[in-house]
Amino acid sequence: MRGCLQVLRWLSTSPARRPVSSGLRLRSYEIVSPSILRPFTSTVRRQAQASRNVSDLEKRIAEIPIERFRNFCIVAHVDHGKSTLSDRLLELTGVIEPGSNKQVLDKLDVERERGITVKAQTCTMLYNHNGEDYLLHLIDTPGHVDFRAEVSRSYASCGGALLLVDASQGVQAQTVANFYLAFAQGLELVPVLNKVDLPSADPERALEQMRSSFELDTDNAIKVSAKTGLNVEQLLPTVIERIPAPVGDHTNALRMLLVDSWYSTYKGVILLVRVFDGEIRAGDQVVSFATGLKYYVGEVGIMYPDQTPQSVLRAGQVGYIYFNPGMKRSKEAKIGDTFTKVGYEKKVEPLPGFEEPKSMVFVAAYPSDADHFEHLEDSVNQLILNDRSITVQKESSEALGAGFRLGFLGTLHCSVFEDRLRHEHGASILITPPTVPVKVIYKDGKEVTVTNPAHFPDEDEIRAKVAELREPYVMATLTFPDEYLGKVIELCEANRGIQHTLEYFTSSQVILKYELPLGQLVEDFFGKLKGSTKGYATLDYEEAGWKASNIVKLQLLVNKKPVDAVARIVHYSQVERLGKQWVTKFKEHVDRQMFEIIIQAAVGRKVVARETIKPYRKDVLAKLHASDVSRRRKLLEKQKEGRKRLNAIGNVVIDHSAFQAFLSK
């Protein structure tokens, strides 16, 4: 207590006459020069330096009119070098140190491990062109088809895009898909060839593919190497000259679009926003058009490349905000929502939102230990805040306990989510094989979409009440060298595909379009395609409606009792193959018991595959004399009766690890 009083007395004195202390003993007052006074810690000095840098940055941004803003993104096929090119642009504008080569905008651990972009990330850059400062907003988008929703949301914040093509691989399936998405949004496209320094690069072939596939003027295409930085300095002047400035007026009422959101333990929900009109500052009260809820803004800022606070965000800017008190419920942050200031709700037209992506692949997720369900629930809720395309429903299984039915856009989307649960949240989980939704059309006209095999109608109900069963189809676009054409067609036909078109867009490259059941696509079709073409094929797909199909529910029975967690909806042609796989694999992981265990795969009442696990058998004849036939027969009959009673009342004990091993690939 005495020490605290001494410190308070010391703080209350004027800086020039504070005592020079040693430990807690106070000496006589001495005159201290202000020039040699030091801050309490080095942290204070660092924060002061940071605030000076932020104010310098703000001052430059404040002097730039909206006519010198440019919002653009980079779109391409997966692994064509988008994130590496983003790094070079950030180096060029001084946002990061040269040579860091860290893929700064890939912020998730799973992105760095897999070398793919999963979440669209934004960064603000300042660039001086012809003696004038320009404010550039770069958005690095994913390339994989499963993250198409991320790409389309990014386009809403952009005026143009760099269409990036690998000079060694040329135009590929997702290049085509991303081009049409950007074209439909009316974006100005700048063709860019990457990896021109590779020995295998063929720029002329790639440019010809871009001309023939997209009808783009490639005379002014920029040939770069994101890895070495070759010609990267030509990109930003081209962006400034060709991509239009955003339209908006900072003097109008605030109109702000919610583009993305993520969760912070300390700040609550953080929102990534694009300001279309007006301006927003800390302390403003805003209202959501979607929910009607009102919030006070706690902080606004830009990504530079990390969160950098600013005093204001103006029309045309892309930045982040969070509220104080924070938005704590993830459901309040609706992607595509419009915000305005309180009092202007009737004067402002809400912006058109985004089309909600539909989940097309479903899995069940259970904690490895039933006691960890709450931890799994918290982890899932935090991750879906950052990815709204995932649907979540609670469900329960007799075998595996409480869990979730999760819906995803595709199998890679599911795999990435599983990795994030394990690595970022330490969750230990069981994931069932992916299934796709099916439609049940009843005779009375009612239509039901079934995403959980447990809700699929049984055989009797189908015969009595159901008019038709339908499964989803996709239009798959495959590109590959023509030498593999026969193998790819064979693979597509084996997966119940319907051929639509076959085109050569170069003398050796083929674009093949097939209509395929989505259920076949999620069963490692891409892996088989890569195997058939030695890794040279690329795949993109889009929804193609629903078709009538002969689909059934395949169940696993253990001693004639169904194991609910392992049921699947499949086409009838797959029943026998899958059934044999199931019973053989499940037998490997179930321990022997004191009674016989019968493992069956069945469709309705029809058993399609069976395996038997023999019981332990005690040698009851070990102590008998060889000639004692009647006693021998009596003991064997007694053992046989005991086994019958066990079979009637015995419950099969299946260890949790058996399900874990069975569900693992």
Curated annotation (Swiss-Prot):
PROSITE patterns: G_TR_1, G_TR_2. Residues 1-53 form a transit peptide. Its EC number is 3.6.5.-. GTP binds at residues 76-83, 140-144, 194-197. It is a peripheral membrane protein. It catalyses: GTP + H2O = GDP + phosphate + H(+). GO terms for biological process: positive regulation of translation; translation. GO terms for molecular function: GTP binding; GTPase activity; mitochondrial ribosome binding. Keywords: GTP-binding, Hydrolase, Membrane, Mitochondrion, Mitochondrion inner membrane, Nucleotide-binding, Protein biosynthesis, Transit peptide. Its main location: mitochondrion. Belongs to the TRAFAC class translation factor GTPase superfamily. Classic translation factor GTPase family. LepA subfamily. This is Translation factor guf1, mitochondrial.
